[in-house]
A protein has these predicted regions:
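HotDog/MaoC-like acyl-thioester-processing domains
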Residues: 1-2, 84-146
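Hot-dog-fold acyl-thioester-processing enzymes
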Residues: 1-79
């Protein structure tokens, strides 16, 4: 079962470079032909581009996930939310990011067993430390089958 003592635990800080080529690749992979995402000079990142943050995290960020003690065989991605406090980042922007375990709660599953919900928030800040965007994801560890 998920380690509930992890609520409030903060992962390492890391940088995420918004690269023009990666913005274009992401836009094409998601079927978008929006010119704002494909602009060669100042491409705007699509709102869900921040999901790529997992590729930028340093190896020690995995410690946060390991310490949660989630059974990966029973893991589901439950929800994803993005909040932009400023305009979406443009190509060339460097975002500073950090993830926190915001909440862990349980619900009885309909097919047996208790499900654990882990809500994690990643804050993306600019060079001045102002929060530009937040990503909130909910992982679900499904109940063990008896």
């Amino acid at each position: 079962m998920v380690n509930k003592d992890m609520v409030g635990r903060v992962g390492p800080k890391f940088d995420m470079v918004v690269e023009r080529g990666k913005v274009r690749e992401f836009a094409r992979a998601t079927g978008s032909d929006n010119a704002d995402y494909l602009d060669d000079s100042e491409a705007v990142s699509p709102p869900t581009f921040l999901t790529t943050v997992a590729f930028w995290q340093p190896p020690e960020a995995g410690d946060l996930y390991r310490q949660l003690d989630i059974d990966l065989r029973r893991l589901l991605h439950g929800e994803q939310e993005f909040v932009f406090l400023r305009e979406p980042p443009r190509a060339g922007t460097v975002l500073h990011a950090q993830t926190i375990v915001e909440e862990i709660y349980e619900k009885e599953g309909k097919r047996g067993g208790v499900m654990a919900f882990v809500v994690m928030r990643t804050d993306f800040t600019d060079d001045d430390g102002a929060v530009v965007a937040q990503s909130r994801s909910t992982a679900i560890e499904t109940g063990a089958r008896s």
